[in-house]
Amino acid sequence: MASSFKSPADTAKACVGVAALKEKAPLSNLIVLSFVAGAYIAFGGLLAEVATGGMAAAGWPTGLVKLVFGGVFPVGLMLVVIAGSELFTGNCMYMPMGILQGEASVMGTIKNWVGSWVFNLVGALFVAYVLAYLTGILTAEPWAATAVTIAKTKALGGAQFIAAGKTVTSLSWMQVFWRAIGCNWLVCLAVYLAVASDDVIGKSFGIWFPIMAFVCIGFEHVVANMFFIPVGIFIGGVTWSQFFINNMIPATLGNIVGGAIFVGCIYWFTYLRGTNKAKA
C-alpha cells in the first residue's frame, strides 16, 4: 500500500516547490488569498472566544479554559492550508527555504511578506468588525469582558489592569517577541506536517496538535492578534497605537524568526543544502 505521507526530505522539497509557486503568483492572487487567510484565522479566534466566554469568571480552572480555547482555534489554520490561502506566518517558513534553494528571490519574498501581512490584516479586521462586533456576537456579556481582557493582555505593553476583580499584568514588548518566536516555530511545524501528509485527515491532525499547543501555552501569533486586539478596540479598552507598537511590531519580528530560522532554515540545512541553484 502506498504511503500517505512524505519523508522529511521530500517534505522539504515540497516546501521549496510551494515557495517557487508563491514567487510566480500574480499580485491579484496574493491580495485575495491573503484576505481570506486573515479571515480564516479570525474565524478560529472568534470560535475560541465564543467557546470560552465567561468560563474563567465562572471559576473554571485556567488550564482547562486554555485547553478549550486551544482545542477549537486550529480550525483557522485547517481552512488556510486545506482550502488554500496566503498566510504571512506560514510564508515566513516557505520563502526563506525558496531563497536558500534558489527558487525564490529576496524581492519576491518581500512582496509576498508585505502583501500577505497587509491583507491578512484586512481580512482579520473584516471578521473582527463585521462578523464579531456589528453582529453583536462578542459585544454581549460574558463574551465582551473576555474579548477585552484578551486584547488588553496582548496590547498594553506591560501595564496592569483590573479584570474580573483581579489585577492582570499585560505582556511587555519583549515578552510578545519571545512568545512570537515560539508561536511560529509551532505554527510552521504544523504547516510542515500538513505538507508532509497526502490526505485531508492527515493534514488536519498534523495541524491540530501544534496549533493547540501554541494557543494553550500562550504564544503570540501576529495574524490571530489582528483579530483579537481590534475586537477589544471596537468594544473599548485598547487603542490603535497600542495595538501596533506593543504587539504588531514584536509579534511580526518574532514570528519571522520562529518560522524562518527554527523551521525553514533548519530543514533546508538538514535536507537540501548543497543542492541549490542560484536565483537573482
Curated annotation (Swiss-Prot):
It comes from Methanobacterium formicicum. GO terms for cellular component: plasma membrane. This is Probable formate transporter. Belongs to the FNT transporter (TC 1.A.16) family. GO terms for molecular function: formate transmembrane transporter activity; high-affinity secondary active nitrite transmembrane transporter activity. It is found in: Cell membrane. The lineage of its organism: Archaea, Methanobacteriati, Methanobacteriota, Methanomada group, Methanobacteria. The keyword Membrane applies. The keyword Amino-acid biosynthesis does not apply.
